[in-house]
From Swiss-Prot:
It comes from the Bacteria. It comes from Rhodothermus marinus. Zn(2+) binds at residues 450, 453, 468, 473. GO terms for biological process: DNA repair; DNA replication. This is DNA ligase. The lineage of its organism: Bacteria, Pseudomonadati, Rhodothermota, Rhodothermia, Rhodothermales. Optimum temperature is above 55 degrees Celsius. Active from 5 to 75 degrees Celsius. Thermostable. Keywords: DNA damage, DNA repair, DNA replication, Ligase, Magnesium, Manganese, Metal-binding, NAD, Zinc. Residues 633-712 form the BRCT domain. NAD(+) binds at residues 66-70, 115-116, 151, 174, 215, 332, 356.
Length: 712
């Protein structure tokens, strides 16, 4: 039967060309290609980058992640640096973005709104700073070490606000940096943007003319609520908060914009008349704050480059604590007269640079979908991907959650897909790039049988997951053994997933208690095990016998019993025998357990094989009693209280602080709510601090926490 492939759309052709170029620039040494090949590659890069710039800056509908765009732009810059004659007037390296649409009135910026050059690592920041130092030394006639202001790079829509005699007169998008779009009526609907600069006697009258530059953005919680509302009305949700902010500002109907929960941060100024402006960028931010503009509280001024780099490292690790998206840190030479001395190149200032975080999102090809069997028998689809770098690591597999997830997003084998990796979260496929489809993609369905043991898969009522319910499924036991030995359970050093698989598949370990029967000669039979490695593993296994009871409970893999639940159980039951004898009602009555978990625990202990396992572990010397440090705390101000931690504490790590709170009978939560009793605040706190202030929740520093714990 003859098949017909649907013609590709313009978006599909652009994505296909982009994907090919990304593979080329990742695989080829651009320093080694000859001029002819460089000319052809540069032409393709210009064409593709200009199309993406138009979609990003004008349509506010990007097709690819920023990291992919940046990689292609870097490649073009390298080629143009090697062969300067390849630079053309229409090269995206010579301009900020695309031309504005005709739907809004055009506004010419009094001073260009330039973009920023990117720094993709600490070395790039050092190179930028040293270049600034050299240029300033040449122009000042003496060496200088300029201070740097560091600001979070808010992921939103750039905006220029013009005030005349203190009254908002124009709000304009960046557009191409020279001309933007007049979105004044929409900007007036954003509560955070002053319509009139308030007169403050301490500050003096407002400037006769002032251009404030900043970013319109949407908070994560507001974005989630907006998408819920859109989906409830049957409308298409936004892909991310940046798109939501940009799409809301550029609505033709200001009444629609007024209903969108938009926010604003001011980060700089353009032309100013009728006022004295501080010479320091950091002090400009404070001045804008006094004028009534919202300014991000995390901006800092540093005298030393090492402190700047530490700030970048901190926010790379802690950005998820914020209630808004950031995609980097903007670094600026603080002294504004020196900014003027440094000047700008065609599309970016020399005195500023954007330190970009490792990409958390990328587009790659979905090669296949396989299924993985977990320790509880849950069977989940796993995406097999064309390898791509996301979040600083190469990703070749990602989670697809369950069959409903795949079907609801119409993810097909052969699709180009968007992959994200946020923080320590497992990489996941979030959506297909439908515009890139050729017609050759294949839908996927969950197999009927377990890939490990061949048993019929079962979907339980009310659940999205399928399960293998065979008690002798080999794949389940491998995962259970790996979990049992894991860092948060029995913490057996040297026993990762590969060793767990070897021990299970060789028949040396099954059930878990066999782990404590292993002998040196058993391990020496395994591939990769010499005597030293074998003895080290045996020592680690022996040491694990004395782990706290809560770790053993977690390691047993009882469904719904995580680390926190295991700790709660040990507070109530002094031994595993006491826990095994507890009724469902007794278990469900425990705060933080509930009826579903209670039934799961009771059912686990009813299984004869599980009861036999516990007896064997006891006979082999594994601790099954509550240790003194796990005992319930005596009455104290902390017992029963809920704590939330935010920011870096001066002496305690976050894990140490959490352990101290738990030992004293307190609980640690991940987010602030009206049920929170205390918020422990360290350096550079995140949005949890703001939320605590709004709710009037008591806040403690490290010393205050230690005093409450009776340790000071």
């Amino acid at each position: 039967m003859e098949t017909h492939t649907a013609p590709q759309t313009a978006e599909a052709r652009l994505l296909e060309a982009t994907h090919t170029l990304l593979q080329t620039v990742r695989q080829r040494d651009l320093e080694a290609i000859d001029r002819k090949e460089a000319e052809a590659l540069a032409a393709r890069l210009r064409e593709v980058l200009n199309q993406h710039a138009y979609r990003y800056y004008v349509l506010d509908n990007p097709l690819i992640p920023d990291a992919d765009y940046d990689l292609l732009m870097q490649a073009l810059r390298k080629l143009e640096a090697r062969f300067p004659e390849l630079v053309t007037p229409d090269s995206p390296t010579q301009r900020v973005g695309g031309p504005p649409l005709g739907r809004f009135e055009k506004v010419r910026h009094p001073e260009p709104l330039l973009s920023l050059n990117n720094a993709f690592g600490e070395e790039d920041v050092r190179v930028w700073y040293e270049r600034c130092c050299r240029m300033l030394a040449e122009r000042l006639g003496q060496p200088v070490q300029p201070a740097v202001t560091a600001e979070l790079k808010i992921d939103g829509l750039a905006m220029a606000l013009t005030y005349e005699n203190g009254v908002l007169s124009v709000g304009a998008t960046r557009g191409d940096g020279i001309e933007g779009e007049n979105v004044t009526q929409n900007v007036r609907t954003i509560p955070a943007i002053p319509l009139r600069i308030p007169v403050d006697p301490a500050v003096g009258p407002p400037p006769t003319r002032l251009e404030v530059r900043g970013e319109v953005y949407m908070r994560k919680r507001d974005f989630e609520r907006l998408n819920e509302q859109l989906q409830a009305r049957g409308e298409r949700p936004f892909a991310n908060p940046r798109n939501a902010a940009a799409g809301s500002v550029r609505q033709l109907n200001p009444q629609v914009t007024a209903l969108r929960p938009l926010s604003f941060f001011a980060y700089g100024i353009g032309p100013v008349e009728g006022a004295e402006v501080p010479d320091s960028q950091y002090e400009v931010l404070q001045w804008l704050g006094r004028l009534g503009f919202p300014v991000n509280e995390h901006a800092r001024r540093f005298e030393h480059l090492d402190d700047v780099l530490e700030y970048c490292r901190y926010w790379t690790e802690h950005r998820d604590e914020l209630d808004y998206e950031i995609d980097g840190v903007v670094l600026k030479i603080d002294h504004r007269p020196w900014q003027a001395l440094l000047g700008a190149i065609s599309n970016a200032p020399r005195w500023a640079v954007a330190y970009k975080f490792p990409a958390r999102e990328a587009i790659t090809r979905l090669l296949d979908i396989m299924v993985s069997v977990g320790r509880t028998g849950v069977v989940k689809p796993v995406a097999v991907l064309e390898p791509v770098e996301v979040g600083g690591v190469t990703v070749s597999q990602a989670t697809l959650h369950n069959e409903d997830y795949v079907r609801s997003r119409d993810i097909r084998i052969g699709d180009l897909v968007v992959v994200i990796r946020a923080g320590d979260v497992i990489p996941q496929v979030v959506r297909p790039v439908v515009e890139a489809r050729t017609g050759n993609e294949r839908p996927w369905r969950m197999p009927e049988r377990c890939p490990s043991c061949g048993s019929q898969l079962v979907r339980l009522p009310g659940e999205a997951d399928y399960y293998c319910v065979a008690s002798d499924c080999p794949a389940q036991f491998v995962r259970l053994l790996e979990h049992f030995a894991g860092r948060d359970a029995m913490d057996i050093e040297g026993m990762g997933s590969q060793v767990a698989r070897q021990l299970a598949e060789s028949g040396l370990v099954r059930p878990l208690s066999d782990l404590y029967r292993l002998k040196l000669e058993d391990l020496l039979k395994l591939e990769g095990f010499a005597e030293t490695r074998a003895r080290n593993l045996l020592r680690a296994i022996e040491a694990s016998k004395q782990r706290p009871l809560s770790r053993l409970l977690f390691g047993l893999g009882i469904r719904h019993v995580g680390k926190t639940t295991a700790e709660l159980l040990v507070q109530r039951f002094a031994s595993i025998d006491e826990l095994a004898a507890a009724t469902i009602d007794e278990l469900a009555a425990l705060e933080g357990v509930g009826p579903i978990t209670a039934e799961s625990i009771a059912n686990w202990f009813r299984v004869e094989d599980n009861r036999r396992l516990i007896e064997e572990l006891k006979e082999l010397g594994v601790n099954t009693q509550r240790l003194p440090e796990e005992a319930p705390a005596a009455e104290s101000p902390v017992r029963g209280k809920t704590f939330v931690l935010t920011g870096a504490l001066p002496h305690l790590t976050r894990k140490e602080a959490e352990e101290l709170i738990k030992r004293a009978g307190g609980r640690v939560a991940s987010s602030v709510s009206r049920n929170t009793d205390y918020v422990v605040v360290g350096e550079n706190p995140g949005s949890k601090y703001d939320r605590a202030r709004q709710l009037g929740i008591p806040m403690l520093d490290e010393d205050g926490l230690l005093r409450l714990l009776g340790m000071k």
